[in-house]
Amino acid sequence: ATNPSGQ
């Protein structure tokens, strides 16, 4: 899943 923290 895409990390919403911007990593």
Curated annotation (Swiss-Prot):
Its main location: secreted. GO terms for cellular component: extracellular region. It is found in: Secreted, Cell wall. Keywords: Cell wall, Secreted. This is 30 kDa cell wall protein.
